[in-house]
């Protein structure tokens, strides 16, 4: 074996081992929109792992009442909120992942989109079950005022002109305002019935 082959082999070995050594957690959400409960969950996860992979789920959906924001817009919301909260961004990966509508393939599809992770943080029963069946360590996250910090209720408040701005980081308020997100959501909620 020549020296170049040995170097390549050693590099591949080291990369693989460094990748495996990272204590990296996975956190999946749609973030429609990103709110203070999400921010607290990420802070909690980062106390338990070296790095976090934040998966922007349902990445292919946007411009509908349940998923009004694009994957790109959600990435911006998450990133700006983390930066404003002084979260060490060198410990964060944000990855958009489209839905796979076949549960037995979802975990392997997600693995293909993300860097290696060795622990999953989720309270959602199906997510927990799918990862446990794939031999992942799965931990629950402490809910942070779940009834108040809930994306569905935040979208409903946006639609009904109720106060929602205190439920999301200020950077998210500013970004949703910039992209005219409230009017988008209201337009999506309209019907053409007479």
At which residue positions do the language-model features occur?
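Nucleotidyltransferase catalytic core that binds NTPs
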Residues: 2-194
């Amino acid at each position: 074996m020549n020296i170049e082959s040995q170097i390549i082999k050693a590099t591949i070995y080291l990369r693989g081992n460094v990748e495996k050594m990272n204590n990296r957690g996975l956190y999946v959400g749609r973030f429609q929109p990103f709110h203070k409960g999400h921010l607290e969950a990420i802070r909690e996860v980062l106390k338990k792992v070296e790095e976090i992979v934040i998966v922007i789920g349902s990445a292919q959906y946007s411009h509908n009442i349940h998923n009004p924001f694009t994957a790109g817009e959600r990435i911006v919301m998450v990133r700006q909120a983390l930066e404003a909260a002084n979260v060490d961004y060198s410990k964060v990966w944000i990855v958009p992942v489209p839905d796979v509508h076949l549960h037995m393939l979802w975990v392997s599809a997600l693995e293909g989109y993300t860097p290696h992770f060795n622990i999953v943080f989720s309270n959602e029963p199906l997510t927990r079950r799918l990862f446990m069946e794939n031999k992942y360590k799965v931990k629950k996250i402490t809910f942070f005022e779940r009834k108040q910090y809930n994306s569905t209720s935040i979208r409903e408040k946006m639609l009904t002109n109720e106060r929602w701005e205190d439920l999301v980081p200020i950077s998210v308020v500013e970004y949703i305002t910039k992209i005219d997100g409230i009017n988008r959501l209201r337009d999506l909620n309209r019907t053409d019935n007479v």
